[in-house]
Amino acid sequence: MKIFYCDGSTRGGKNQKGADNIGGWGAVCFSDESEMHIEAFEHDSETYTTNNRQELKGLLWCLYYADDFHPNEECIIYSDSAYVVNMCNSWIYNWATNGWKTSKKQPVENIELVQDIWKCISKPFYHCTIKKCDGHKGILGNELADALATQSMHIFDDLCKEYEVTIGEEE
């Protein structure tokens, strides 16, 4: 069995869109039969990103990884995001049935990510369970995923500082 942890993070404002919201996600995978430990992260330079968007990207990596490399193996994906867990275990089924509208008849946010997740979890032989874990409580996998999400934003900041470029005409 594979066990995944995923996390998302933004610098700026939690789930408030803002031009300076640089985001990142992190994910780790553990195996109970071996000492496999895979880490992945990505910074996201899109502006106006949110924590929820980054949380979804981390989850999507876990789903893709499980499907690509362990298609018939049970897995558990842990997230400290109530949004991610509730979406996967409840809301998404209603959204798909209701034309991707929320219970308040509003369009689902992050629709492209949500629909990609739906493609994964609606497969006939879907094999992942998505569970909630407490964030920042010393759970190794969650702490590692959080560190990767945070690290990805710092890498982006460092690259921006190292390669400052002015575009336009010189005076």
Locate predicted features.
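RNase H-like nuclease fold core
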Residues: 1-57, 64-68, 147, 151-157, ...
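RNase H catalytic domain
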Residues: 10-16, 22, 60-144
